[in-house]
Amino acid sequence: MPPKGTPPSFESELPGRPGANWAALLLPPMAALSIGAAAIHFAVTAEHFTEFWLFGVFFAAIAWFQALWPLAYLRWPTRITAGIALAANLGTVLLWAWTRFVGIPLGPSVGDAEVVGVADLAASGFETLLCGILLLLVVPAVRSRLLATPVSRSAWIGSGFWVVVVVAITTWVLALHGNDIMVMGH
């Protein structure tokens, strides 16, 4: 256990759980969020290829990245691996926001703002939550502040459980109903 006041590291054992560390504990909710976003991106890749080939390439690439990233993190649970995922997912969320509020930056519909649909909102929500967890792993100051007490650590553990449950249910519903539940979709 690190000295008092030292932020828990990736390798820090969890109090009362010998052999368990923060990196391993946070993998299930991170994997659920990443795979949930990947499933949504896989589902819309073909549609985006018909709009513009580069859109399809982007959706295929981010879907594969999000599907495979948890395996890479399982093998290499480092700040670098977490940082790469943080950059990719944060970039995707920012691009999503840009295309909704400013307009599509390139392609045949350049300048047109996309409508917000339930599926893309869910994927962006998953990515945003994933970025929050990744921030814990990448930035020690965030980790030390948010995991400073046993109560806050327990809250994060409980939140992680509910993230997995909500992502699983949302992904399942979207897989079953897809475009039928679009709020404002195309």
Task: Map each language-model feature to its residues.
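Membrane-interface extramembranous regions
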Residues: P2-H186
